[in-house]
Amino acid sequence: IKTIPVINSAIKNNSEVILYETGQHPEKAKNLIKKISGDFKHVKFVNGTKDIGTYTGLLNLMIVSLFKIIFKKNKNMKDQLCIVHGDTLSTLIGAFIVKRNKGKLVLLEAGKSFPGMLKHFPESFVRYYVAKLSDYLIVNDSDHKEQLIKWSVKGEILTIARNTIYDSLNLVSLENKIEKNKVTIS
């Protein structure tokens, strides 16, 4: 959901947008894609109709994806900016697709720390590894920037004024419905 405001902005600015759907959450993706305004190309990298919620399903998705990444090259991606977000298997698959095809990997909300690689596995591994692969890392505070420096990332760290969650809240029309001084987080 956090990439949709970026997608809509790119479309509004007449950029060609290609959305790669990795297949981890096809049911959720179907509803989110409806929030995209304008023309874009939609590529289903792995076909599926049900959201994957088991480790066996995730392992199968990873194996199928790795074979496709290794044997199916996309020359049109070379030197293009390719945006990923999150700490799921889809994020890692997206990063592998981009790097295999020599695209420029952009990671939104980079540098979020974690309590230990094994305490929050595989999300912590994905967050760290995708940051190491990224050409551009978007952060919104100094703590995240410091974390990326500690991780010795090679990509360029870019600081933005606010977290992309604000754009996401606006997308689902919640920003104007919340009380400014009252927040509940679960």
Task: Label every model-predicted segment.
Residues 97-113:
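Active-site proximal beta-strand in glycosyltransferases
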Residues 79-81:
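Structural motif
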